[in-house]
Structures are given as structure tokens and as C-alpha cells.
């Protein structure tokens, strides 16, 4: 939920209010076309709000703070504003927010010390299965803990200018390092818990930002996190981004999918 922590308006990815988090790619590069076929664009009506990942033909995983009653998704998009014949639109039939996510923070524009944005993940059941193609492919959940120091790739259409809210046209990628959670704990007064990951570049300049919430953090080729929250302006030195740690939630995800075939 890229709730930007200064101004973390849950604008991050579309949540009109989430405190300390914001998401967009800063200091990155244009992703190679169709190189992230699992990346999903999550909308509220016709408004882009967040990223997400395709888990299988029926399910998308995104951040809980991206929740709206009228979520829908586009799969296989590269350019956010162009019609692309290979892209697929799907309505969402049902949303499953993690039961421990604190919804009272969902639209709170004021962030407070010790606010806890843990459990920031949500499953979206598609109304019609996605067609799996060369440009629309699912990604597997992690089976092992990520290793500190791993090279991670984050992607999204979030703002590419730290102090200005302006979505990217083309899907952006950025390389980050997986850092100790202590680095994020020192950077923020909000809680950094064991269900979160800390990733960034110590000198700043590279980060996710507003609009990137819910998008993937892929470390050493494995999906390990979802963009959740961080500092505004994005990319500041000693202000890494915070991500939902997916290895902690694989059982909940698998159980939810199995119980809702």
C-alpha cells in the first residue's frame, strides 16, 4: 500500500488513504515488453489504483489497502494508457482480505507512531478465468525464506517522480537489495514486523512509490513480497520500502484458494 509515510496517503496504489505508504517506481527503467507477464493492473471502475500478481487463471494477489468494492483488473498490459490486443480485462467476483489486516487504517489519512500495517494482502477471485498466453502467465508462491542481500526486482506503473504524483505510461522495473528489517525499523516510527520485508538502496534514489502498491517484489527470481508502504518522497536515503513477506502467508493463500474453487 505504499502508504507514504510522510504523506503516505494510501494513494499509493489507489487507496485513498493509507497512512504511511506510497508506491511507484523511482530510479528504475522501462521493463522489457512482456517480461513481467504475471503483473496485473488493479482498477477501481476505470481508475488505475494498484499492481498485483496473477497466481493462477482464477486468482490475483494484491495489497489489502487496494481494496474497493468495484475492483477489476487488466492482465498482460505494458502501457497503462494504450489499448493492447493481447491484454485481458476481468471483473472481480469476490475479494478476500487477510482477516488480520487492520481495516481501521484503510482510509485514515493521518499516520501515527506505532501504526501497524501488517497483513497487507488480499486475494481477488476473477469472474472469468484468465487465458494463459505468452503475455499472461501466473507466478509461483515462494517455498523458502528470502536471503538477505538478495537482488530483488520490483515493478509497477506508479509515479516515477518522487515529489509529483504522475503514473508511468509503460511498466517500470527497479533493482533493489533485500535489507535487514532493522534498517526499516530505524527508518520509521510505524511498526516493522516479521511479516514484512525491507528492500531498497542504502544511498537512496531507487524505490517503489505511489501507484506501485500490491505489485511484486521478486528476489533471485522468486516472488517474495508485495509492495506495501514507504516514505514520501520516495527514494530518500535511509528510507527503504516495506513489503508484505509472502512466505508467511502461503498457507492462508492456499487455503483460501482451495476453499473457493
Curated annotation (Swiss-Prot):
Query: Does the keyword Isomerase feature in the UniProt annotation?
Result: no
Give the residues annotated as active site.
65, 120, 213
Query: Can you state which reaction this protein catalyses?
Result: Preferential cleavage of Arg-|-Xaa bonds in small molecule substrates. Highly selective action to release kallidin (lysyl-bradykinin) from kininogen involves hydrolysis of Met-|-Xaa or Leu-|-Xaa
Prosegment residue ranges: 19-24
Instruction: Give the record's keywords alphabetically.
Output: Disulfide bond, Glycoprotein, Hydrolase, Protease, Serine protease, Signal, Zymogen
The disulfides recorded in the entry are 31-173, 50-66, 152-219, 184-198, 209-234
InterPro entries given in the database record: Peptidase_S1_PA, Peptidase_S1_PA_chymotrypsin, Peptidase_S1A, Trypsin_dom, TRYPSIN_HIS, TRYPSIN_SER
Q: Which residues form the Peptidase S1 domain?
A: 25-258
CDD domains per the UniProt record, alphabetical = Tryp_SPc
Kindly list every residue the record annotates as glycosylated: 102
UniProt xrefs under Gene3D superfamilies: Trypsin-like serine proteases
Q: Listed GO molecular functions?
A: serine-type endopeptidase activity
Listed EC numbers: 3.4.21.35
Q: A single GO BP annotation from the record?
A: vasodilation
Show the SUPFAM superfamilies listed in the entry: Trypsin-like serine proteases
Report whether Flavoprotein shows up as a keyword of the record.
no
Protein role: Glandular kallikreins cleave Met-Lys and Arg-Ser bonds in kininogen to release Lys-bradykinin.
- PANTHER family hit by this protein: KALLIKREIN-1 (PTHR24271:SF47), KALLIKREIN-RELATED (PTHR24271)
Family, similarity comment? Belongs to the peptidase S1 family. Kallikrein subfamily.
Q: Supply the name of the protein.
A: Kallikrein 1-related peptidase b1
Species for this entry: Mus musculus
Q: Which gene encodes it?
A: Klk1b1
Amino acid at each position: 500500500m505504499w502508504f507514504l509515510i510522510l504523506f503516505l496517503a494510501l494513494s499509493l496504489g489507489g487507496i485513498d488513504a493509507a497512512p504511511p505508504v506510497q508506491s511507484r517506481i523511482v530510479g528504475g527503467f522501462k521493463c522489457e515488453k512482456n517480461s513481467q507477464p504475471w503483473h496485473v493492473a488493479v482498477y477501481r471502475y476505470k481508475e488505475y489504483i494498484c499492481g498485483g500478481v496473477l497466481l493462477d487463471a482464477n486468482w490475483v494477489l494484491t495489497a489489502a489497502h487496494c481494496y474497493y468494492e468495484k475492483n477489476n483488473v487488466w492482465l498482460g498490459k505494458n502501457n497503462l494508457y494504450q489499448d493492447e490486443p493481447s491484454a485481458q480485462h476481468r471483473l472481480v467476483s469476490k475479494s478476500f482480505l487477510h482477516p488480520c489486516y487492520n481495516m481501521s487504517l484503510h482510509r485514515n489519512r493521518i499516520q501515527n507512531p506505532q501504526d501497524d500495517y501488517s497483513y497487507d494482502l488480499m486475494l481477488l477471485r476473477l469472474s472469468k478465468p484468465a487465458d494463459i498466453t505468452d503475455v499472461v502467465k501466473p507466478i509461483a508462491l515462494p517455498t523458502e525464506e528470502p536471503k538477505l542481500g538478495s537482488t530483488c526486482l520490483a515493478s509497477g506503473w506508479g509515479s516515477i517522480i518522487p515529489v509529483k504524483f504522475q503514473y508511468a505510461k509503460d511498466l517500470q522495473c527497479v533493482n533493489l537489495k533485500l535489507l535487514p528489517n532493522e534498517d526499516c525499523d530505524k527508518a520509521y516510527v510505524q511498526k516493522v514486523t516479521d511479516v514484512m520485508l525491507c528492500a531498497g538502496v542504502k544511498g537512496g534514489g531507487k524505490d517503489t512509490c505511489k501507484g506501485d502498491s500490491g505489485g511484486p517484489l521478486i528476489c533471485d527470481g522468486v516472488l517474495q513480497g508485495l509492495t506495501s508502504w514507504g516514505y514520501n518522497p520516495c527514494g530518500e536515503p535511509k528510507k527503504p520500502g516495506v513489503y508484505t513477506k509472502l512466505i508467511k502467508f502461503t498457507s492462508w493463500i492456499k487455503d483460501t484458494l482451495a476453499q473457493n474453487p
